[in-house]
UniProtKB/Swiss-Prot annotation:
Subunit structure: Monomer.
GO MF annotation terms: (-)-E-beta-caryophyllene synthase activity; magnesium ion binding
Ligand binding (Mg(2+) 1): 302, 306
Family according to the record: Belongs to the terpene synthase family.
Organism whose genome encodes this protein: Zea mays (Maize)
CDD domains per the UniProt record, alphabetical: Terpene_cyclase_plant_C1
Protein name from the UniProt record: (E)-beta-caryophyllene synthase
GO BP: defense response; diterpenoid biosynthetic process
Cofactor or coenzyme needed: Mg(2+); Mn(2+)
């Protein structure tokens, strides 16, 4: 009896802590009623986009016979405006032409843009292309701000061991920071944005929304491209809102029946944003909805194991999920039995949807929930034993997996249907280098942002503490700086794998998109937990139509 009372008091304190550190939802029922545009407007927008899409396709055919610099600018503009997904085939052909013509005598600005785009698209191009621009000491000196910006972006698609790109990054970052306040407004805006988030690491929709505003101010803009990008953005925004209406209804029912509000973060809209960062294209509407449902369950499990259930309850609940039958949960308290029933109901509905789509991988879905629960339960053992792993690598063997990124990539592949083969799913399940790199970025970036909160909340020891122990650093700041170096190494691994291409770029790009999403969410704060910090961005992507 005393033990039960102690657990109840402990749980009460946990719930008080939960409400103290996690704000309530910012959205409520908003998307049940929000209609960005009238049906008639939506139909007109789609008709106009269809016409403009064909016009741009003709333009791309003409660009094929233009000079290299014009090709690069055209591709770069389409990508920044978020229109490139309409022209995958055409851009692939242009990039092939660009690669074949790469040995031309180009200036430093064009060389930097060429290098960036080729590497971004998975082409092997040596960083030695920059050697000819160095002085007697090997330093590349220029005071042209646009050139510095192009070099800075190029340096962010480096791989381990490319000293020349390491030096370019250090030099250009320092110089851009020094001159940014003196630049003309449009270029100043571009440089500030680049210093905050390099082009290669930006989310497609966030980048498109920002660049549409910048492009509108350009004296050399193509007005048809500008109008096309606005309409396309608004069409996707409207589609996302339709998805959020369906998801809001599902989440309200799940939350009410499972009674998760007392301990779990209410972040359904933010979760949709997370999934939209990985799959933004209109054809992946089902992927976004399916993944949002699954990872809202994962988010609930994270909070459940982290601060609500006792160790004994966590063990029993994990065992029940592993059995995945009605009898398995009998040893759990009522609130966990209810949660268990609702989790199984959601997973069953997803499996049925996938079966209707003739998706042969439907049976793999429940494995995500089971494996994530096992990861979270394993972490509680470290917490209870107050165990500090000796090395960051040891820590990451468990904690990187519990970031959920490997599971998200695998489940994302499943949701893509025939786009992802059985071989691709098997590859993803082996924890390949690019997926490991994404998991590392997610875990380390999360730990940097959540260190202070978790250090005072008796949760699992973070990689920050482990790093301090491994490297003998005397301050948290030194440990965090080392963690940031590990994050940069992970980004270089991502670039390396995109050049090696163990799978088609169409699949690898999902892993890269996930890394970009994690970078965004955990750049300055934990944007998922404290979603007030990203509310303005979410408004611009879900609420505010572009005029």
């Amino acid at each position: 009896m005393a033990a039960d009372e102690a657990r109840s008091v402990s749980r009460l304190h946990s719930e008080e802590d939960m409400h103290g550190k996690h704000h309530s939802t910012l959205w409520g029922d908003f998307f049940l009623h929000h209609v960005p545009c009238r049906p008639g407007q939506y139909s007109i927008m789609k008709d106009n986009v269809k016409i403009m899409k064909e016009e741009v396709k003709k333009m791309l055919l003409d660009v094929g016979s233009s000079d290299l610099s014009h090709k690069l600018e055209c591709i770069d503009t389409l990508e920044r405006l978020g229109l490139d997904y309409h022209y995958t085939k055409e851009i692939d052909e242009l990039m092939c032409n660009v690669f074949e013509a790469r040995d031309q005598d180009l200036d430093l600005t064009t060389t930097s843009q060429l290098f960036y785009l080729l590497r971004k698209h998975g082409y092997h191009v040596s960083s030695d292309v920059f050697l000819k621009f160095g002085d007697d000491k090997g330093d590349i000196v220029t005071d042209d701000a646009r050139c510095l910006l192009r070099m800075y972006e190029a340096a962010h698609v480096r791989v381990n061991g490319e000293e020349i790109l390491d030096n370019i990054l250090i030099h250009t970052k320092r110089q851009l920071q020094c001159i940014v306040d003196d630049l003309e407004p449009t270029l100043q805006e571009e440089v500030r944005y680049a210093l905050e988030t390099p082009l290669f690491r930006r989310l497609n929709r966030v980048q498109a929304r920002q660049f549409i505003s910048t492009y509108e101010k350009s004296t050399t803009r193509n007005n048809m491209l500008l109008e096309f990008s606005k309409l396309d953005f608004n069409i996707l925004l409207t589609l996302y809102c339709e998805e959020l209406k369906d998801l809001t209804m599902w989440w309200k029912e799940f939350q009410a029946q499972a009674n998760t509000a007392i301990y779990a973060r209410d972040r359904m809209v933010e979760m949709h944003f997370w999934m939209m960062g990985v799959f933004f294209e209109p054809q992946y509407s089902y992927s976004r909805k399916m993944l949002t449902q699954l990872f809202m369950i994962v988010s609930v499990l994270d909070d459940l194991y982290d601060s609500h259930c006792t160790t004994e309850e966590g063990n029993a609940f994990t065992a029940a999920l592993q059995r995945w039958d009605e009898e398995g949960v009998e040893q759990c308290p009522t609130y966990l039995r209810t949660l268990y029933t609702n989790i199984r109901a959601t997973v069953k509905a997803i499996e049925e949807d996938l079966n209707l789509q003739n998706n042969k991988h439907a049976k793999l879905v429940k494995g995500l929930i089971i494996d994530m629960a096992m990861c979270y339960n394993a972490e509680t053992e470290w917490r209870d034993k107050k165990y500090v792993p000796a090395t960051v690598d040891e820590h990451l063997k468990i904690s990187a997996r519990s970031s959920g990124c490997m599971h998200l990539v695998s489940q994302g592949f499943i949701s893509m249907g025939d786009v992802a083969t059985s071989e691709a799913l098997e590859w993803a399940s082996t924890y390949p280098k690019i997926v490991r790199a994404v998991c590392i970025i997610a875990r380390l970036a999360n730990d940097i942002m959540s260190y202070k909160r978790e250090a005072s909340n008796n949760t699992m020891v973070s990689t920050v503490q482990t790093c301090a122990k491994e490297y003998g650093t005397t301050t948290v700041e030194q440990a965090i700086e080392k963690i940031r170096e590990l994050i940069e190494e992970a980004w270089m691994d991502i670039t390396h794998e995109c050049l090696r291409q163990p799978q088609p770029m169409a699949l690898l790009e999902r892993a890269v998109n996930l890394a970009r999403t994690m970078d965004f969410l955990y750049k300055d704060v934990d944007g998922y937990t404290d979603s007030r910090s990203i509310k303005g961005i979410l408004d611009s992507l879900y609420v505010d139509i572009i005029d």
